[in-house]
């Protein structure tokens, strides 16, 4: 037997030994996966049972509170606070357990498990989401500038509007996945992206004509301003979140948002004038479009729908920001009154 053939045979035996070890390791891996699935099922059912009992207990406490003495009322209040705290713990637990997707994710992805099991994977996905927002904000800013000052063609406007639709659709999907993994983004700042997706889609279908041309430059100027404000928000919010996480005051899955939240009060109040300016520009867009919808040359249904959508965006953004600012001022006023 030649030396080369002997060497091949020796390598094969070495590979055979490694393969046997690999098979054993893979067997253990599958066994651990089955154990993990069993533990996940056990935890999920236990949490559901606990939540049901806590819900019943909360209703009972509410009935008891009506006829309780002062001492009993304090006990009821303490127990209610403990229940609220326990519910927050369950929320954190469920972030590491498989769960049914919401309606939106089911429609887009189907019944696929999107739960990330490690903190490292969750944070990596959140970080990638933030980078996606930053890069697309810069691209949209450049696109809006190009369409406003250089490319005066309907086809380039359609490309820009299609990019907006794709951007907001992608944001809603990624945010839904992050919410499934324990991110606490909620309320209007989630709905805001669904409304923006709809608005961008209607803009995409608006045919070229005199009415479109009357609104085109105003919309592109608004898009430029909005992208600049979003870039500022991302840049400063990210630094603020990093500092608050280091102090243990924020969750590691908290996200930057296109608005104002209570945690931004320290260090980011300088953004408020820009935000309110953007909100009132949305109102200005709505008023302009309502006027254009009554123009004698207007035949497109998109004009009135866009006007109504811009009005919804203004009301949602303005009232939510105002609510946060008012609540924070009330809280600060309460602190100053305390001896």
From Swiss-Prot:
Compartmental location: Nucleus inner membrane
Record-annotated disulphide pairs: none
Keywords attached to this entry: Coiled coil, Membrane, Nucleus, Transmembrane, Transmembrane helix
Coiled-coil ranges per UniProt: 1-77
Pfam families: TMEM120A-B
Membrane topology, record value: Multi-pass membrane protein
Primary localization: nucleus
Transmembrane segments: 102-124, 132-152, 159-179, 187-207, 270-290, 302-322
Any single biological process term in GO: fat cell differentiation
GO CC terms of this entry: nuclear inner membrane
Self-association and partners: Heterooligomer with TMEM120A.
Protein family membership: Belongs to the TMEM120 family.
Described function: Necessary for efficient adipogenesis. Does not show ion channel activity.
Name this polypeptide is given: Transmembrane protein 120B
Species for this entry: Homo sapiens
């Amino acid at each position: 037997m030649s030396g080369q053939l002997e060497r091949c045979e020796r390598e094969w035996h070495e590979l055979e030994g490694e393969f046997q070890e690999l098979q054993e390791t893979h067997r253990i891996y599958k066994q651990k996966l089955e154990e993990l699935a069993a533990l996940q099922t056990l935890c999920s059912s236990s949490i559901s049972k606990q939540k049901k009992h806590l819900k019943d207990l909360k209703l009972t406490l509410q009935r008891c509170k009506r006829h309780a003495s002062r001492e009993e009322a304090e006990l009821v209040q303490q127990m209610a606070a403990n229940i609220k705290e326990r519910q927050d713990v369950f929320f954190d637990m469920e972030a590491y357990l498989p769960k049914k997707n919401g309606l939106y994710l089911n429609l887009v992805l189907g019944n696929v498990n999107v739960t990330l099991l490690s903190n490292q994977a969750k944070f990596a996905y959140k970080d990638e989401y933030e980078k996606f927002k930053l890069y697309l904000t810069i691209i949209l800013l450049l696109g809006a500038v190009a369409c406003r000052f250089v490319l005066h063609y309907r086809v380039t406007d359609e490309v820009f509007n299609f990019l907006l639709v794709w951007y907001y659709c992608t944001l809603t999907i990624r945010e839904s996945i992050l919410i499934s993994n324990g991110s606490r983004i909620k309320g209007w700042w989630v709905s805001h992206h669904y409304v923006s997706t709809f608005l961008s889609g209607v803009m995409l279908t608006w045919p070229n004509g005199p009415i479109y041309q009357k609104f085109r430059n105003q919309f592109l100027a608004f898009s430029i301003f909005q992208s600049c404000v979003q870039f500022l928000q991302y840049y400063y919010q990210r630094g603020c979140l990093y500092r608050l996480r280091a102090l243990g005051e924020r969750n590691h899955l908290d996200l930057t948002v296109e608005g104002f939240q209570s945690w931004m009060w320290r260090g980011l109040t300088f953004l408020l004038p820009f935000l309110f300016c953007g909100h009132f520009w949305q109102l200005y867009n709505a008023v302009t479009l309502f006027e254009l919808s009554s123009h004698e040359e207007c035949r497109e249904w998109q004009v009135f729908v866009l006007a109504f959508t811009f009005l919804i965006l203004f009301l949602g953004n303005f009232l939510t920001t105002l609510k946060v600012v008012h609540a924070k001022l009330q809280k600060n006023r309460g602190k100053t009154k305390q001896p």
